[in-house]
Design a protein with these regions (language model features):
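Acidic, surface-exposed loops and disordered segments
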Residues: 1-205
Length: 205
């Protein structure tokens, strides 16, 4: 593999139907250029997330972010596990995505069973808008989940969903060998392995 940018998603991915190209072109890179992201670009991504659908219009998503080389960066970056620090240190910004587990309606508090589901929809909007602006995003599940609520200052009725690294995609020469081999768009399962008419088919799992 070249040490330059990897093959385009079009060479590795193919849709069976007329899906808009951005869904296929977006993929999660670890190879990021250490450039600053303008605040306006980051806010545009958050604004896209804002329009996601949610149960009761509760909008349970919350985003906590830090630009690299700012005082908050070290606190957020320190939550990542060692393996993820090996590549995420070059990100332009880190974002922790959090969901609220309840909402208040007419002075009464109700649980929201779909808080994670709805926040996932907001994350998709964030990631797709970032792609349209020329940025790559990668969700990070490997972080200190026990410490994160305290570091982020969360009340008990909030849940940390994921961390996200965002930045311009770069060449892979600075990546560890184990990451270089993985730095390519991933494939997807065929439709008939997860879409069923009328009844679930366990054989496909």
């Amino acid at each position: 593999m070249s040490l330059n940018l990897v093959e385009t998603p079009a060479a590795l991915r193919k849709s069976d139907f007329a899906v808009a190209p951005l869904f296929i072109e977006r993929w999660s890179s670890r190879s990021l250029a250490p450039d600053a992201i303008p605040e306006a670009d980051l806010m545009t991504c958050f604004d896209a997330a804002r329009w996601a659908p949610s149960a009761f219009n509760a909008q349970p998503w919350r985003f906590i972010y830090a630009h690299r080389d700012t005082p908050d960066w070290d606190r957020l970056f320190g939550l990542l596990n060692i393996k993820n620090r090996q590549w995420a240190y070059r990100a332009s910004a880190l974002v922790f995505i959090v969901s609220r587990k309840d909402f208040v309606f007419q002075d009464e508090t109700f649980p929201v069973g779909s808080h994670s589901f709805d926040t996932g929809a907001a994350w998709a909007g964030f990631a797709l808008q970032a792609h349209l602006l020329g940025y790559s995003t990668r969700a990070i599940g490997g972080f200190d989940r026990k410490q994160a609520p305290e570091t982020l200052g969360l009340p008990d009725n909030y849940h940390v969903e994921t961390a996200v690294a965002i930045g311009r995609r770069a060449g892979i020469e600075h990546l560890e060998d184990v990451f270089r081999a993985q730095e390519r768009p991933s494939a997807r399962r065929p439709l008939d392995s997860f879409v069923f008419a009328g009844r679930f088919h366990a054989a496909h799992d």
